[in-house]
Swiss-Prot record:
Domain remark from Swiss-Prot or TrEMBL: The PWWP domain harbors the heparin-binding sites and is responsible for DNA-binding, while the C-terminal region is essentially unstructured.
GO BP terms in the entry: cellular response to interleukin-7; negative regulation of neuron apoptotic process; positive regulation of cell division
Keywords: Acetylation, Cytoplasm, Disulfide bond, DNA-binding, Growth factor, Heparin-binding, Isopeptide bond, Nucleotide-binding, Nucleus, Phosphoprotein, Repressor, Secreted, Transcription, Transcription regulation, Ubl conjugation
Phenotype for residue 108 to A: Abolishes disulfide bond formation
PTM comment, free text: Sumoylated with SUMO1. Sumoylation prevents binding to chromatin. Phosphorylation at Ser-165 is likely to be required for secretion.
Annotated S-S bridges: 12-108
Cross-link (Glycyl lysine isopeptide (Lys-Gly) (interchain with G-Cter in SUMO2)): 80
Record's function text: Acts as a transcriptional repressor. Has mitogenic activity for fibroblasts. Heparin-binding protein.
Alphabetized CDD domains for the sequence: PWWP_HDGF
InterPro entries in alphabetical order: PWWP_dom (IPR000313), PWWP_HDGF (IPR047363)
Organism of derivation: Mus musculus (Mouse)
Protein name: Hepatoma-derived growth factor
Matching Pfam families: PWWP
Oligomeric and partner information: Monomer, and domain-swapped homodimer. Interacts with nuclear proteins NCL and YBX1/YB1.
Amino acid sequence: MSRSNRQKEYKCGDLVFAKMKGYPHWPARIDEMPEAAVKSTANKYQVFFFGTHETAFLGPKDLFPYEESKEKFGKPNKRKGFSEGLWEIENNPTVKASGYQSSQKKSCAAEPEVEPEAHEGDGDKKGSAEGSSDEEGKLVIDEPAKEKNEKGTLKRRAGDVLEDSPKRPKESGDHEEEDKEIAALEGERPLPVEVEKNSTPSEPDSGQGPPAEEEEGEEEAAKEEAEAQGVRDHESL
C-alpha cells in the first residue's frame, strides 16, 4: 500500500518507467499537466517519453519509479528510441520537445490500442483500393476489346469502300463519254437553226419581195395588151 500511495504522489519532474500497450517499459518523466486537461484526465499524469519525445496521459498503475525499476526495465532494447531514452534520462533529464511534436505525439501515444483499428481501416482502404484497381483493370481489359471490334468494323467498311470505288470511276467515265457525245450533238444541231433564223429576217432586206410583185404586174400588163390587140384585130375584121 505504501508503494501505491507513493506512486499516486508523483510530482512534476519525477523520473519513471511508463508502460503502454504495445511498448516496453519506457524511460519517462512526469510532466506538467495542462489545466484544461485536469478534469478530463483525473488521476492521470502527463508523461514525457525520453528518446521519442512523445507525451501521453497514464494512471499510477502504469508508472514505476525509475531508480527502483532501473535494473529491471533498464536493459537494452532494439526498439527505436529506447537506447536514446536511457541516455537522456541519465544525462539530460530536463530535455523538452517542441509544442508541435508534443501535441501531435500526445494523441498518438495516448491511444495506442486504436492503432490496430486504424491499420484495419487502412486495410479496408487498401482492399477497396485493390477492388477499385481490379475494376479498373476489367474496364481496361474491356476497352481494348471494344476498340478491336470497332477497328474490325472500320476495316470492313474501308474494304467495302475500296471494292466499290473502282466500279464507280468506270460508271462515271461512261457517263462522261455519253455526256460528251450528247453535248457534241447538241452543239452541232443549233448551228443550222441559227443560220435559218438569221436567214429569215434577211429575206425582206434583200429586196426579193418587190421584184416578184413587179413580175406579176408585168404579166397583168402583158395580158391586158394582148386582150387590147385582140379587140383591135376583131374590130378591123
